[in-house]
Amino acid sequence: MKRKMLNVPKGGYDGMKGFTIVEFLVAGLLSVIVLIAVVSSYFTSRKLNDAANERLAIQQDLRNAATLIVRDARMAGSFGCFNMSEHTEKDVFFGVTQKKPLFSLKGNSTNKLIPIAESPNIGYQGFTQRLNALIFQYGIDDANASAETTVVSSCGAISKPGKQIPTLEDAKKELKIQDSDKEQNGNIARQRHVVNAYAVGRFGNNEEGLFRFQLDDKGEWGNPQLLAKKVKRMDVRYIYVSGCPEDEDAGKEEQFKYTGKFDSFVTPAGVEVLLDSGSDAKIAASSDNIIYAYRINATIRGGNVCANRTL
């Protein structure tokens, strides 16, 4: 059988053709555009993720700072069954001269014992402080407290002797309680004096932030703890209560005063702390991630005298 051959006319088939230079250029340009879009999308997502992570970290730092401030406020003035808001300086039997007035039980008041204080300069070397610091003091159980931080108290008196108190008999002697008075034994507490200060400022040319300073075993400020970065201002306001109704004053309510002025003669019922970063603080170089104000509200134990909440 004869095969039929396909006759292709001359000039009718030139073979397979490749891409032209123009087509290569167009394809390459499209590839570059796609690559730029992918890279841009990646870096945008990375930037947003970094900003979100940094914002989350700062919010967590602020929440931790709020927890510490609220706890210190609730503990302020408490030394066992002795509460500073119920006593005057006459109930402080003995106190050695402190390295800083802020470490004294009497504070600046000439009558009432005030468990919180303000200070424009806490006196920590190298620290540039902005506005006033907020200071709390109280006692925590510690039988091995150093001589500089030992505090002994009963329900009616307190002493910071400047030495360790190893026995109950020594504690009763400091508090001028007769050794034969056994009924007072359960009221006597041997504690460590805690003084915590919160201040906004900076060290050298470093960034400003909120720092916490604590009284150490040597009776000095210990190493500061950075609680939150980028904080530039701490505004503290106080809540004072007055006009407590008597039992026969039916329908009468106590009066609350909300003020930014600290009264060194009256224990406030509460404090409000506003932490602010200012309008020029940015997160992860993103102009739309300004750190806004953070408000902390805390009550002071024994401050609301109308409620008689001293325990």
What does each model-identified segment do?
Residues 19-22, 132-134, 196-198, 208, ...:
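Residue-level detector of short, conserved catalytic/binding motifs and their immediate flanks
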